[in-house]
Amino acid sequence: MEPEAEIIRAQLFALRDEAYRTFHSALMPTVPPETVIGVRVPALRRLAKQLAGTAQAEVFLQALPHGYYEENNLHAFLIELIRDYDRALAETEAFLPYINNWATCDCFCPKVFAKHKKELLVPIRRWLDSGEVYTVRYGMEMLMRYYLDDAFRPEYLEWVADVRSTEYYINMMRAWYFATALAKQPDAALPWLTEKRLDLWTHNKAIQKAVESRRIPLGMKQLLRGLRIRS
């Protein structure tokens, strides 16, 4: 390990919260507990801001794979702070294959992506087709984050629906995407449920998440409850 990366690891251990480590480890069954230091997200984000743009950060970004969960999250937060689109995209694509849990996958989104929605669709399609669990999940997350408002097109619903997998963390994101689409684009999303165009698990899970959401009107929730399919 490069000395710069060793220094950053020591900084992370200095921020360790053992009680938080125990609690958070239980939420991530795919992450070995011994690889979790126990650093809270606000502290990681503060450290990322301190390191951003430094030579130390550049060395750290090249030090893949990392040994600890928090090193991966710090890596993600450093990518978020990159202001150049091409560089942020390149670092994201280099990092995605090393993500091994939902929490790291869902924790970051480079701010510069919001200014390049048209260009971002190309890598999103590539991520959806990758076959890698968390790369696929990340692609769906980007569609959910940036393309359910003014940039929405009905075909994006098809992109997510066309992802076929037995992986839990992919299918949970598919359901989350459709639940969010019901809140933001109900006219386009609702027919996917009324016409039963999704697989049974995603259909029912999307309804469950939508009914639990505060963004869905009560009338819509009543309709959705009636669309549940009993297996």
Protein language model annotation of sequence segments:
Residues 1-231:
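Alpha-helical scaffold domains
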